[in-house]
């Protein structure tokens, strides 16, 4: 692969060193486990968490005479992902044998795709920001290719004092290796890229994106150079399994390489591991090139071929993807780019929001979902899938505000009750006496009492009318937040002679 530089050096992303500024160059190879019921070349289950060696067929164990048979659903999922990445779909691709020895690779080779992958060049648009002015920066990251391959098994070295065990449950599970171009120039860009890629495959339903389960992991290629110079020698950081760790690994590795180069040394092309405990990378082995694996077409598998009708049928059924959904939220619902970005970041959040916003004011629904619901979930350490407040319940709270049954302040208290205890919002308001006071006589009495008790404050307000809000706050406090704020404000202005 010929590396092409598509970016102009950005001063904001340069790293200062003893000999001047340095630029990081980052490319990523993301392994995404295909969402399918069975493996790439066998009928064995892909269920996560089963007992060791439960999900193993004779094909996965590489028993003599066992031949691979392609799983059509895995092919469909790869094509769907390619379409979601705006990539070229190759209607003819070839499976190759990648030869190397490892105890958890029973065949002695991995079935992958080398020269002729199923998906060619595509792109992802990432957004950084907002900055202090509220602006976002959109950056296009090129996709070099996507190919299908088998996952390996898992070696376990902590089960016995003198022996290592091998679990082949993962052996033969379908992976999509999504290879980016070296277009990223900072750890923030790399994290944004991984976040966006995970969001896309989750929207498509082609990978669950659960990095903690190993179903999505990244090999991060890092090099440094003087701004605009030739590409440096890259090091590959293997199997990084969290977005936060990706950022930490890049920051450490870039500074390690800069220190070596500024000391007059050179960078060795190697594979490294990231140690999250120490926050540093360490050498694993020298980096192999393609010829070290002796790739050749797998003689047990015919070339994979399909027609344009196959691709078009999949394209027709693609769901709305994050960028399109964000554009619709901004154009049709009047949301800010920031709010729309938050809501589309995860498919589950977007689905929840759309259920709440159906038939209601989109901006009000967005405020409640982002500020109240997501804030409460974050504080509780929960994800949107674990929310105790259903879209119907949150929509019910919004409806009660619109009907002026409760005030905005009472709505916050009501949300907290629903979040912690559950229940129907309307029933809770009725049973706990939380209805808004709309009786102007009762509100007027409270206003009169507070004005009479605070003559000094009255004088201040008459001198500076903008201070009238103090009286509104006191009345709301006196009524336990149940008074209608608009009615209170009107009465305060009338009593103090502040009407326009």
UniProtKB/Swiss-Prot annotation:
GO molecular function, one term: asparaginyl-tRNA synthase (glutamine-hydrolyzing) activity
Any one of the GO BP annotations: glutaminyl-tRNAGln biosynthesis via transamidation
Family to which the UniProt record says this protein belongs: Belongs to the GatB/GatE family. GatB subfamily.
SUPFAM superfamilies assigned: GatB/YqeY motif (SSF89095), Glutamine synthetase/guanido kinase (SSF55931)
UniProt source species: Allorhizobium ampelinum (strain ATCC BAA-846 / DSM 112012 / S4)
Catalytic reactions of this protein: L-glutamyl-tRNA(Gln) + L-glutamine + ATP + H2O = L-glutaminyl-tRNA(Gln) + L-glutamate + ADP + phosphate + H(+); L-aspartyl-tRNA(Asn) + L-glutamine + ATP + H2O = L-asparaginyl-tRNA(Asn) + L-glutamate + ADP + phosphate + 2 H(+)
Gene3D superfamilies: 1.10.10.410, GatB domain, N-terminal subdomain
Name of the molecule in the record: Aspartyl/glutamyl-tRNA(Asn/Gln) amidotransferase subunit B
């Amino acid at each position: 692969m010929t590396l092409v530089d598509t970016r102009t050096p950005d001063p904001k992303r340069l790293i200062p060193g003893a000999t001047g500024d340095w630029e990081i160059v980052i490319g990523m190879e993301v392994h995404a486990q295909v969402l399918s019921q069975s493996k790439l070349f066998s009928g064995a289950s892909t269920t996560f968490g089963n007992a060791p060696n439960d999900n193993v067929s004779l094909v996965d164990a590489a028993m003599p005479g066992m031949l691979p048979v392609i799983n059509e659903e895995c092919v469909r999922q790869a094509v769907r992902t390619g379409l979601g990445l705006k990539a070229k779909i190759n209607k003819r691709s070839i499976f190759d044998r990648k030869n190397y020895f490892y105890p958890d690779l029973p065949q002695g080779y991995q079935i992958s795709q080398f020269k002729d992958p199923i998906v060619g060049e595509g792109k992802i648009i990432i957004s950084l920001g907002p900055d202090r002015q509220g602006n976002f920066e959109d950056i296009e990251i090129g996709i070099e290719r996507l190919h299908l391959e088998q996952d390996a098994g898992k070696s376990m070295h902590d089960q016995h004092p003198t022996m290592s065990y091998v679990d082949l449950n993962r052996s033969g599970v379908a992976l999509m290796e999504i290879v980016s171009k070296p277009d990223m120039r900072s750890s923030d860009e790399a994290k944004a890229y991984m976040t966006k890629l995970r969001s896309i495959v989750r929207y498509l339903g082609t990978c669950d994106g659960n990095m903690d389960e190993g179903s999505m992991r990244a090999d991060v290629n890092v090099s440094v150079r003087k701004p605009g110079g030739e590409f440096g020698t890259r090091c590959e950081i293997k199997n990084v399994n969290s977005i936060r760790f990706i950022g930490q690994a890049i920051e450490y590795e870039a500074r390690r390489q800069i220190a070596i180069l500024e000391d007059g040394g050179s960078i060795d092309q190697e594979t490294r591991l990231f140690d999250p405990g120490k926050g540093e990378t360490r050498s694993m082995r020298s980096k192999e090139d393609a010829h070290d694996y002796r790739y050749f077409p797998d003689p047990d598998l015919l070339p994979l071929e399909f027609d344009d009708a196959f691709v078009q049928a999949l394209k027709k059924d693609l769901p709305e993807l994050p960028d399109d959904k964000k554009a619709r939220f901004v154009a049709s619902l009047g949301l800010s780019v920031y709010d729309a970005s938050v809501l589309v970041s995860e498919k589950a959040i977007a689905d929840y929001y759309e259920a709440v916003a159906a038939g209601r004011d989109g901006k009000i629904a967005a405020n409640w979902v982002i500020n109240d619901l997501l804030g409460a979930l974050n504080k509780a350490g929960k994800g949107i899938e674990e929310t105790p407040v259903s879209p119907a319940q949150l929509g019910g709270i919004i409806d009660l505000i619109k009907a002026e049954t409760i005030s905005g302040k009472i709505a916050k208290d009501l949300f907290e009750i629903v979040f912690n205890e559950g229940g129907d919002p309307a029933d809770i308001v009725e049973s706990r006496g939380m209805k808004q006071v709309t009786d102007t006589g009762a509100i007027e009495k409270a206003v009169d009492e507070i004005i009479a008790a605070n003559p000094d404050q009255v004088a201040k307000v008459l001198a500076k009318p903008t201070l009238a809000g103090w009286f509104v706050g006191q009345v709301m406090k006196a009524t336990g937040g149940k008074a209608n704020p608009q009615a209170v404000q009107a009465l305060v202005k009338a009593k103090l002679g502040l009407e326009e």
